[in-house]
Regions:
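A conserved amphipathic terminal alpha-helix motif
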Residues: 128-173
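Hydrophobic/aromatic beta-strand elements that line small-molecule binding cavities or substrate pockets
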Residues: 13-15, 73-80, 104-113
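Beta-strand/loop substructures that line and gate deep hydrophobic ligand-binding cavities in soluble
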Residues: 94-147
Length: 173
């Protein structure tokens, strides 16, 4: 992943998951998987270039002091996809239940086998060039959200969907 430009907002996370890279990446495109690990209520995610990628979360009971009510929709365009290795989303926007969208952003996800090939190292990088207060707050909320979501992804894939109940990725711990 290239280094961020000066003034850019970036979230970078990496995690190891005991499954294949293909299985990890497919969990970003299968509605049942997305519901299980990311808590989405609706998904239109097509794993091919120039196709839509849209996920929706139900509105939360929590209201952020800057962003308002959380939940809403994250939508963009699949620009590149490499089977079992990576995908890149561009023109990515977060639209909260109320208020103006935040975007455009980019999301890159990469997955590589490590060790004996039964474990995958997956990395995500979400980035944007804007730097206003609302953007900074969104990236702060999403940094925590990605931590919870990736933990849930690992639990979902390693435990075949049998995991303790978790609240929405938007809810505070």
């Amino acid at each position: 992943m290239p280094p961020p430009s000066e003034g850019a907002l970036v979230i970078e996370r990496a995690i190891q998951i005991r499954t294949s890279p293909g299985r990890v990446l497919s969990a970003f495109f299968q509605p049942r998987d997305l519901a299980a690990w990311w808590g989405v209520s609706n998904a239109v995610t097509v794993a091919r270039p120039l196709a839509p990628y849209a996920v929706q979360w139900p509105p939360t009971h929590y209201t952020d002091e800057v962003l308002g009510q959380l939940g809403g929709t994250l939508h963009g365009t699949v620009m590149d996809i490499r089977d079992g290795a990576s995908f890149f989303l561009a023109d990515l926007y977060y639209t909260p239940p109320e208020g103006a969208p935040i975007g455009p952003m980019a999301l890159e996800v990469e997955a590589h086998p490590i060790g004996d090939g039964r474990t995958t190292e997956m990395s995500i990088r979400q980035s944007a060039d804007d730097n206003g207060a609302r953007w900074q707050r969104y990236f702060g909320v999403m940094a925590e959200g990605w931590d919870r979501a990736l933990d849930a992804l690992r639990e979902h894939l390693e435990w075949a969907g049998v995991r303790p109940h978790r609240g929405s990725i938007w809810e505070r711990r």
